[in-house]
């Protein structure tokens, strides 16, 4: 019974590292506690304790997925993630440093697996998202996956030889000094950007039931700000296709001509193949200068895998239209400065984010959080976005229909944040980075980390078998 309680405590401590708690030290304690519980146990016990820890972690973490659609989708998602998490219990563990090293490696590998599998993956709840306030200077060097490995290595350090601890701490200290010396070139350029959080009439799945209402709210919330170079609207700000609907097009073109500035619009287009989630840059003359189509679609939100099964589980599955994904990155540009839009779910996959942030001077994260009500989803998503800003060493303009609309600096710190659930405009001075600048983390793919994890696990297995 004691181990059952400790397993549940371990899972809750993992959860405590994420919003709304964001206690960065909690995952360190959780990983050590989980390792100690699993040591010297039989397979049934290991798997049971791992599963209990996973449930205590993912059930509260993903509770936002039950808002408006009921408990069944939430339970299916949380249990599915917990089963993948519980794979850590399939290996026999002992209180030896080689086992602890292997534990941290396999734990990180399971996180990468969750990021990619199934249905393209769901990387929510990775330890690498929890350390922005404690290790933000390290993100540009090793990225989210590297941070996950570092946190999970706590179990390794606990029983490691003192010399090993000294070596690892020395490497971390050297990296900290390098991060201060080799900071990215900001070019000395500043771009004034105004993010518009127009809000919705009603939170929930029917936030856009009244045609054009969300668009009208964003038009009304957009007022002319002196010297603003770019206005940005969130995902789904135009709930009707502004390229096909004449009234919607006129509302936007009249607005940008009055503003005398460019406007980035999150819109839902209607194509012959199906709806497309797009980011449209309207120039000051009212013409569309660039168009990016979201590539990494959210399973069960923007398309429905195993539709027949999903519809038998939840009636809301029938309301999901299958969106058409884009097939390439399209850089927007303002005053000759390239930037990229990442749309909502696109911030989750390491490789996708790294490809998207390369060659940019800053990044816009467009999202719509109206469908998750007053849950912690928006705060958790902002935490993830902060990690991405630190990883790419680029400032982020985060714009949401209902919040949190924010300005993040290149270290992932929140410089400004609009309150939730109100119509707000947030004007920020964005420091631009040389688009040629790439952090070391931006050059490390999932395949690289798979190789590193493979080498580390092979080394640990060799030491164990001796």
Each language-model region and where it sits:
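Membrane-embedded alpha-helical bundles of multi-pass enzymes
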Residues: 1-181, 223, 374, 385-388, ...
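Soluble catalytic domains of enzymes that build or remodel membrane lipids, polysaccharides, and related
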Residues: 182-444
């Amino acid at each position: 019974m004691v181990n059952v309680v400790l397993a549940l405590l371990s899972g809750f401590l993992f959860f405590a590292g994420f919003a709304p708690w964001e206690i960065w030290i909690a995952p360190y304690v959780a990983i050590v506690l989980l390792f100690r519980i699993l040591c010297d146990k039989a397979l049934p016990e290991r798997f049971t304790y791992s599963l209990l820890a996973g449930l205590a972690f993912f059930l509260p973490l993903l509770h936002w997925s039950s808002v408006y659609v009921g408990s069944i989708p939430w339970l299916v998602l949380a249990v599915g993630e917990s089963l993948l998490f519980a794979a850590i219990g399939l290996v026999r563990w002992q209180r030896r440093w080689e086992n602890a090293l292997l534990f941290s490696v396999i734990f990180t590998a399971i996180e990468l697996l969750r990021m990619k599998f199934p249905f393209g993956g769901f990387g929510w709840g990775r330890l690498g998202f929890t350390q922005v306030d404690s290790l933000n200077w390290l993100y540009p060097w090793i990225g989210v996956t590297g941070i996950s490995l570092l946190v999970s290595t706590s179990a390794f350090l606990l029983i490691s030889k003192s010399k090993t601890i000294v070596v690892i701490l020395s490497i971390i200290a050297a990296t900290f000094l390098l991060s201060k010396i080799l900071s990215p070139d900001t070019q000395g350029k500043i771009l004034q950007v105004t993010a518009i959080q127009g809000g919705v009439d009603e939170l929930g799945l029917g936030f856009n039931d009244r045609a054009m209402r969300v668009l009208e709210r964003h038009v009304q919330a957009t007022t002319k700000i002196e010297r603003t170079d770019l206005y940005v609207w969130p995902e789904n700000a135009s709930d009707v296709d502004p390229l096909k609907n004449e009234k919607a097009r006129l509302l936007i073109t009249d607005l940008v001509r009055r503003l005398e500035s460019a406007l980035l619009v999150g819109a839902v287009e209607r194509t012959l193949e199906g709806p497309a989630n797009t980011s449209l840059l309207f120039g000051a003359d009212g013409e569309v200068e660039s168009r990016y189509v979201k590539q990494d679609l959210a399973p069960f939100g923007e398309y429905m895998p195993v539709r027949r099964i999903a519809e038998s589980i939840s009636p809301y599955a029938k309301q999901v239209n299958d969106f058409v994904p884009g097939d390439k990155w399209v850089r927007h540009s303002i005053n000759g400065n390239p930037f990229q839009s990442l749309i909502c779910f696109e911030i989750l996959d390491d490789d996708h984010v790294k490809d998207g942030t390369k060659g940019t001077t800053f990044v816009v994260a467009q999202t719509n959080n109206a469908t998750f009500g007053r849950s912690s989803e928006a705060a958790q998503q902002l935490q993830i976005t902060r990690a991405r800003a630190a990883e790419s060493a680029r400032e982020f303009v985060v714009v949401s229909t209902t919040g949190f609309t924010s300005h993040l600096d290149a270290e992932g710190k929140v410089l400004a944040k609009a309150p939730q659930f109100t119509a707000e405009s947030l004007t920020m001075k964005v420091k631009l980075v040389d688009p040629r600048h790439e952090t070391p983390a931006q050059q490390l793919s999932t395949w690289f980390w798979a190789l590193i994890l493979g080498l580390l696990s092979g080394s640990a297995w060799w030491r164990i078998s001796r």
